[in-house]
UniProtKB/Swiss-Prot annotation:
Signal peptide, first to last residue: none
Name of the protein this chain belongs to: Ribosomal RNA small subunit methyltransferase A
Name of the gene encoding the protein in the UniProt record: rsmA
EC numbers, comma separated: 2.1.1.182
Any GO molecular function: 16S rRNA (adenine(1518)-N(6)/adenine(1519)-N(6))-dimethyltransferase activity
Catalytic activity: adenosine(1518)/adenosine(1519) in 16S rRNA + 4 S-adenosyl-L-methionine = N(6)-dimethyladenosine(1518)/N(6)-dimethyladenosine(1519) in 16S rRNA + 4 S-adenosyl-L-homocysteine + 4 H(+)
Upper taxonomic lineage: Bacteria, Pseudomonadati, Pseudomonadota, Alphaproteobacteria, Rickettsiales
Localization: Cytoplasm
Keywords: Cytoplasm, Methyltransferase, RNA-binding, rRNA processing, S-adenosyl-L-methionine, Transferase
Amino acid sequence: MLPSIAKHAASHQINPLKKHGQNFIFDSSLCDKIIRASNISENSKVIEIGPGVGGLTRSILHKNPKSLTVIEIDERCIPLLNEIQGYYPNLNIIKQDVLKINLTDLIYDKVTVISNLPYHIGTELVIRLLKEAKLITNMILMLQKEVVERICAMPSTKAYGRLSVICQIVAKVEKCFDVAPTAFYPHPKVYSAIVKIIPLENPPSIALINKVEQITKLVFAGRRKMIKSSLRNLVPNIHEVLTQLKINNNDRAENLTPKDYLRIAMQL
């Protein structure tokens, strides 16, 4: 029988490292609550990014998925994860930096992605995962609360921006619940939150997502400027394009919907 999460980590003398952005969760009931939001079943194939000392890993395995592949950069955690694997043969362990992995080499069928993401790579990794949306059933991600609010933000709100647009052209997004700093060791300075991201049945192509990235980078750099001014260098006939799409030339970045940005990208 496995010891508690905290005792297991202590037995391997694993303390959180700042360079990996580690904040461990030792509360198994919180881990179970997070995994319940994923709706995984015995037929699910799951990828967990950054399992650390295995809190979420255990809760996933209790659901008895068809397979669970964990990707961990910290070699100190591998022996601990190997011990968990001894009880759960459906667990596969990859020691690698997820940012250096070609995810398409790992995913051969629809998967659920679960992660307590380090804050410093959260946004970058979310966008990378969105570009593989056709291979993903859903994602349950723990991120900084502010980032989750940006992902879920509606047009004409303060939090609405590039990340909101990119996420919402690819997927349905839903904030599940907040997680207090006291749930982690060590305590971060800010709240976290759980977000559920469910890719659309027919998400945009990677090429189209890249175009939306390019457009939103320009317009949200000057979010109070009119769209026609922000995009003039990228799209010389921007006035005609916006008029054709029935988008007000005088609108600002925060006024356009994700669908509006997708429609503009399709004209490039």
